[in-house]
């Protein structure tokens, strides 16, 4: 464990923020820098079959150290950080033996407060790694990377019995592209775990069904003084569309297994307006109903418009709930839960109100639930991780490898 913190601080020093709307994968040069660093480290550790694809997927194998027909299992994390907040010049603060109260983030007015983030009350006495209030931290998912790399070192150094262990580090997870170029056949694992979760004990095998909705509204602009019966205000149509979307089914009004409609962006003029929604729901039927609802709203608002004015709606599915795939292989969850209990951790099975690479991989033939990293408040300047949580994640990864070998 001695190098766990060192690894993490090294990885977050690299700016690997991904970028939406870019065709190339990885979408940013910084991701390549981390991928090449990890490739070098994996080779130095003596792993075999170390490959880095042209689309930025890094794979490697820690060979089995015991005989027998032991299934190969995998551990996966992503190298990019969220586009929602800067990942440049990350300056972590290490708060040892947290005693409660507000933590000043850097020299400004930003604080990490238990009033806003009550989970801090549960972390007294632990070592917290925070931001300086200017960037995100990058624990999502560089904590996962550091934990996988450290677990590999522990398996080697302590000669713990294990089968073949596959590891992979992917790009552009935050913009939904990483898993699309993942070669499941080349990875050659029976199942895998993404290490991309949150607080200690979290084990996730349910995620949202997800879709994006892009709405293009074309109006007609004339001088306001002579506009009666002629002007068609695209912004007014956009407002009418949003007024039809259920207000109590938005992200800020929902939790747990509740789905939502989220207006992520809206821009425009009288002549032209564009709206971007995301739709999320755990239930597949409700997910389809939400998509139909958006189509009905667009049709209703667009009824009777002049032929040169129109509303165009495009819906694209992003990913689906992996529960239906992971549930076919209950032993994957059983092993993870047993590993946590063996490490003194009570498993917390909870839904992911989001998505992971594992969701897409599960539908590509690689069942892939999600393990905790020990991090909190991802995608923003209040992000932090506990060193103790990271250490527990390492122990769980090692124990999963050990249990898989023992059960076969």
Curated annotation (Swiss-Prot):
Xref: HAMAP family: Aminopeptidase_M20 (MF_00550)
Listed GO biological process terms: peptide catabolic process; proteolysis
Known EC number: 3.4.11.4
The protein's enzyme class: hydrolase
InterPro entries in alphabetical order: ArgE/DapE_CS, Bact_exopeptidase_dim_dom, Peptidase_M20, Peptidase_M20_dimer, Peptidase_M20B
CDD domains found in the cross-reference section: M20_peptT (cd03892)
Protein name: Peptidase T
Keywords: Aminopeptidase, Cytoplasm, Hydrolase, Metal-binding, Metalloprotease, Protease, Zinc
A GO term for molecular function: tripeptide aminopeptidase activity
Pfam families: M20_dimer, Peptidase_M20
Compartments it resides in: Cytoplasm
Cofactor binding, note field: Binds 2 Zn(2+) ions per subunit.
Residues bound to Zn(2+) 2: 140, 174, 379
Organism: Escherichia fergusonii (strain ATCC 35469 / DSM 13698 / CCUG 18766 / IAM 14443 / JCM 21226 / LMG 7866 / NBRC 102419 / NCTC 12128 / CDC 0568-73)
Residues annotated to bind Zn(2+) 1: 78, 140, 196
Family: Belongs to the peptidase M20B family.
Keyword NAD: no
